[in-house]
Amino acid sequence: MAEITASMVKDLREKTDAPMMDCKKALTEAGGDMQKAEEILRVRFGNKAAKSAGRVAAEGVVTIAISPDGKSAAMVEVNCETDFVAKNDDFLALSAALAEMVLTQKPADVAALSALPYKNSTVEGFRTELVGKIGENMSVRRFVRLDGQGKFASYIHGGKIGVLVDVTGDEAIAKDIAMHIAASKPKSLDASGVPQDLLDTERRVAIEKAKEAGKPEAMLEKIAEGTVQKFLKEVTLLSQPFVKDDKQTVEQVLKSKNSQCHGFTMYVVGEGIEKKVSDFAAEVAAAAKV
């Protein structure tokens, strides 16, 4: 059996970025053949990736890229299982690169993005290797690419909330509006963007509450309309009190700066993903089976 030296392990680790112990095991299995050991690691990481694929990836980051002229922008959400991995340098570098790829190469969907070249492989190939190295599932969840009427401003809060806002006019106020959106989480720019079924639900609830309170039948529609209007002010960007000056609405602030907001997009990491909950004993039992 060939002697496995520390230098060989180091060289294989530098080539594959795999953990030291995995490198040593692969070299031993390959009888010291570096190329065969590298192939073993690729297979092993692939197997690890397959094991991780069924686990819920509800943490992660949002990354943004904006063209030099500010007219186009892209935003990507990449998920992983734990916040610890969301801070991994390779994971963050991949996530940032994906936003640039979406901006410049305009892939049609996640599958097309995953097939693009990245670091002597493809996005999907690198993702699979990274899953194997880290031992956690990760996935490109969604992205958006936008062409604006004005210029895009952006805001990312802790890597977890990302906002793109399209504004004509004052660039400083555009940045403030992006921060406002992250804090207040409006559902749409104005009333025209709020789904009718959402308004119908608010109206029905308001009528039922008014009935239970003993309000006269003749007043029910008026009460419901008042409730809906209040709801619209709470969930539409232009009607919301501005976070930096709640005596003015966002619309009033924009007008005071001779600016106009054309639209926005917000991503919240893990939004809509059901996180798997398990107790400590179950986690230990699951780990013992791996």
From Swiss-Prot:
Subcellular location: Cytoplasm
One GO location term (cellular component): cytoplasm
Superkingdom field: Bacteria
Recorded coiled-coil stretches: none
Region (Involved in Mg(2+) ion dislocation from EF-Tu), start-end ranges: 82-85
One term of GO molecular function: translation elongation factor activity
Pfam families xrefs: EF_TS (PF00889)
Keyword vocabulary terms for this entry: Cytoplasm, Elongation factor, Protein biosynthesis
Primary localization class, coarse: cytoplasm
UniProt xrefs under SUPFAM superfamilies: Elongation factor Ts (EF-Ts), dimerisation domain, UBA-like
UniProt cross-references to CDD domains, sorted A to Z: UBA_EF-Ts
Keyword Transferase belongs to the record: no
HAMAP family listed in its UniProt record: EF_Ts (MF_00050)
Protein family membership: Belongs to the EF-Ts family.
Physiological role: Associates with the EF-Tu.GDP complex and induces the exchange of GDP to GTP. It remains bound to the aminoacyl-tRNA.EF-Tu.GTP complex up to the GTP hydrolysis stage on the ribosome.
Protein name: Elongation factor Ts
Classification lineage: Bacteria, Pseudomonadati, Pseudomonadota, Betaproteobacteria, Nitrosomonadales
